[in-house]
Every structure is written in structure tokens, then in C-alpha cells.
């Protein structure tokens, strides 16, 4: 049991946080957040961060560790998460990694590829091409060269589009080839519990309801407070988080309220689609339909079975 790490993964709005808090009442878990949005301070409503009450009942590591103007990489996440896993196990507890940033899960479990360093000449060429042809054109080019990577990133995520094309031009190999290649893996046994709603319409409705709830709770005001406190720019990594970019554009006068709402919901649904694409191909994952009544009971039973078998062996 010393090397056992549980991972609760799933698309946005699938019920991960509530289930994680429930699991802490049954097992000696300590939660590590696997969410590239929740790392940011002052970004609470739009990231669906656990409430103060939930965090009191179930503290989460790797929440509120960066300012919105800072960046945080998959490599930094791996360093932090592996250090926390070692500390948790040393205390006699079990790490429970919870979130939907699948790139972080992938890097942690499969190891990080040694990618080529940034090349200013290639980046300048790509930026010039983007100016003349548009980022949509470059995204379509990436879709042809590396459809696996293109399916995992947003069509407006210019930073990741540029990096994926840069890797291809520098090496002749796709980014997805690097990520799936043989790397040094951490010495842990990962149990992957995946929330995978079978009906996309159910998840889409939950996403719309949650986005409307965020707006009612003061999402727009949260973004205004960020602008007042920090030199917020739309190209910051923190502003790639769904909802924030759309509200920034609304506040800048580019969208009216209803257009912002529609685009925010659409962007969140696209995020869920990419997360489900990752999960669909996740080898060895145990899948649970979170729209089914009693799915949490099934997960609790499975965890208990795994722990009992680990102790007996």
C-alpha cells in the first residue's frame, strides 16, 4: 500500500469535487488538486474552486499557489505532486489526486518527454504565418500534422498550437509521439477512477447550469476585481481558463452579455469534449457513469476492494 496512489479524473462539471469530499469520510486520503485553473489565487468562482466549507472538511493541496500573472507548467506540477505524494505516504495516508487537467495526469504517470527548447526563429516564422493566415489556419495545419494533439487543445489556445508546431518543425516528430514515448516513470501504482457520463446532453446541461450559477454568484465582478488588482492581459495562461477570456472580451466591449454567456458555455463544453477524448483512450482506467444513481457507492466499494487486496498481499 506504500506506493498506491488513487486518481479521480473526469470532465468539468462531472461531480469530482463532491465525490472527493465524500471519499475522505471513508478512507485515509489526502487530496492533491490536478487542475491548471485552481492553482490561481483570486480566481474562485470561475474555476469552480471548492467552497470554504468543503476545503475545511477536505483540504486540497495545489490550490491557490500562483498569482494570476504567473505561469505553471506540467513539469512543475509533477515535481510538486510527487513531493506531496511522498509526504502523504510518510504520514501513513494515501494520496488522492483529483481534477480534470489530463495533461498533468499524463505527465505524472507516464513521465515527461525531453522536448526541444524553444527556437526563436521558428516561433517568429509561426507568428508571421499567424499574422498573415490567422491562427485558425495554423490550427488546421496542426490538425493535419498531429490530429491527436489538435484534439486535446483548444482551437484558440495559440500558445500550445505554436509549441506543437514548433516541436514538429524542429524534430520532424509530432508532440503526441513525444508524449506517448518511453519515459522514466515514477515509482507508484496509480489507480485511475474516471467519471465518464455516457449521455453528453446530461453533461452539457450541467455545464450550462453551472455557468449561469457562476454568473449569478459574481463571476463578472470577480474578473473586474482581478483587473483592478493585477495587470491582467488576455494572453496570460490564467486567462486561458474557460469563462475568463469571454468575460474579459465582454468587459472590453467585444461581446454583449448574452453572447459572452453563450461563448462561455460553448468553451466549457469544448473543454469537456477534450477531457473525454483523453479519458476514452486512458489505458487501465476504471470508468463510472456519474449520472447514474449510486455510482459513488460503486466507487467506494471498488476502493475498499483494492485496499483490502493490497493489505492481504
Curated annotation (Swiss-Prot):
The record marks 101, 123 as: Interaction with substrate tRNA. It holds the Pfam family IPPT. One of its GO terms (molecular function) is ATP binding. Its cofactor is Mg(2+). ATP binds at residues 10-17. NCBIfam families: miaA. Monomer. This is tRNA dimethylallyltransferase.
Amino acid at each position: 500500500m506504500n506506493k498506491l496512489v488513487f486518481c479521480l479524473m473526469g470532465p468539468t462539471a462531472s461531480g469530482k469535487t463532491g465525490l472527493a469530499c465524500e471519499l475522505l469520510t471513508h478512507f485515509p486520503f489526502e487530496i492533491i488538486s490536478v487542475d491548471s485553473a485552481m492553482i490561481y489565487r483570486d480566481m474562485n468562482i470561475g474555476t469552480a474552486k471548492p467552497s470554504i466549507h468543503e476545503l475545511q472538511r477536505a483540504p486540497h493541496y495545489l490550490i491557490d499557489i500562483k498569482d494570476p500573472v504567473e505561469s505553471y507548467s506540467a513539469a512543475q506540477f509533477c515535481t510538486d505532486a510527487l513531493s506531496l505524494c511522498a509526504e502523504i505516504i510518510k504520514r501513513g495516508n494515501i494520496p488522492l489526486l483529483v481534477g480534470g487537467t489530463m495533461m498533468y495526469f499524463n505527465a505524472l504517470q507516464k513521465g515527461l518527454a525531453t522536448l526541444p527548447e524553444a527556437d526563436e526563429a521558428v516561433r517568429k516564422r509561426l507568428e508571421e504565418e499567424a499574422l498573415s493566415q490567422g491562427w485558425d489556419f495554423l490550427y488546421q495545419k496542426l490538425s493535419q500534422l498531429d490530429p491527436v494533439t489538435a484534439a486535446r487543445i483548444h482551437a484558440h489556445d495559440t500558445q500550445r498550437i505554436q509549441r506543437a508546431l514548433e516541436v514538429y518543425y524542429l524534430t520532424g516528430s509530432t508532440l503526441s509521439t513525444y508524449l506517448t514515448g518511453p519515459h522514466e516513470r515514477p515509482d507508484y501504482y496509480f489507480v485511475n477512477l474516471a467519471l465518464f457520463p455516457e449521455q453528453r446532453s446530461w453533461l452539457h446541461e450541467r455545464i450550462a447550469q453551472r455557468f449561469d450559477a457562476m454568473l449569478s454568484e459574481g463571476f463578472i465582478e470577480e474578473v473586474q476585481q482581478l483587473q483592478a488588482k493585477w495587470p491582467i492581459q488576455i494572453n496570460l495562461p490564467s486567462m486561458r481558463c474557460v469563462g475568463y477570456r469571454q468575460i474579459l472580451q465582454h468587459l472590453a466591449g467585444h461581446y454583449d452579455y448574452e453572447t459572452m454567456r453563450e461563448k462561455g458555455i460553448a468553451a466549457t463544453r469544448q473543454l469537456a469534449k477534450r477531457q473525454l477524448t483523453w479519458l476514452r483512450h486512458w489505458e487501465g482506467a476504471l470508468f463510472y457513469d456519474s449520472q447514474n444513481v449510486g455510482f459513488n457507492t460503486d466507487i467506494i466499494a471498488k476502493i475498499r476492494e483494492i485496499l483490502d487486496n493490497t493489505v492481504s498481499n
